[in-house]
């Protein structure tokens, strides 16, 4: 079963170059990047006036509100949103904590871009089955 509308994605990262790079690469693969923010608080503020995306690609270590705290808010107020931690932080430390909080996956920023694409495909397939 195919979704009628393209999956929508948000990118939340305090590094503007990373946001632009990820947006460009995802857009070139046909993904619809609908929101960007430089920290969790800015993203939450934008969610109150915009349609929530299907998937959030979320950095962990950001000023104002980090990815962990953002995840708690997202799962409380937008429980259907899928969350992929996208970070340079140590996976062994943050993966388990992120899953506990409700994140759906973790991709290292220095991993091949195909890993992020594969994670997105996996989450889209899970959503189509549900």
Predicted segments, located by residue:
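Two-component/phosphorelay signaling modules centered on CheY-like receiver
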Residues: 16-35
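Acidic catalytic/metal-coordinating carboxylates
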Residues: 39-42, 66-69
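Active-site beta3 strand of CheY-like receiver
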Residues: 51-57
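Receiver (REC) domain active-site loop signature in two-component systems and cognate sites
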Residues: 62
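Short amphipathic alpha-helix used as the core "switch/output" element in two-component signaling
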Residues: 68-79
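Alpha4 helix (beta4-alpha4-beta5 surface) of REC/receiver domains from two-component response regulators
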Residues: 69, 90-107, 111
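C-terminal output helix
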Residues: 93, 111-124
């Amino acid at each position: 079963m195919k979704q009628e509308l393209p999956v929508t994605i948000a990118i939340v990262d305090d590094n503007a170059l990373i946001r632009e790079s990820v947006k460009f690469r995802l857009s070139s693969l046909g993904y619809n990047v609908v929101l960007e923010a430089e920290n969790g608080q800015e993203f939450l503020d934008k969610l109150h006036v915009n349609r929530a995306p299907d998937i959030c690609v979320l950095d962990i270590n950001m000023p104002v509100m980090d990815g962990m705290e953002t995840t708690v808010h997202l799962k409380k107020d937008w429980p259907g949103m899928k969350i992929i931690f996208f970070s340079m932080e140590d996976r062994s430390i943050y993966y388990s904590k992120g899953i506990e909080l409700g994140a759906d996956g973790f991709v290292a920023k220095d991993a091949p871009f195909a890993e992020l694409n594969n994670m997105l495909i996996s989450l889209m397939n899970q959503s189509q089955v549900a």
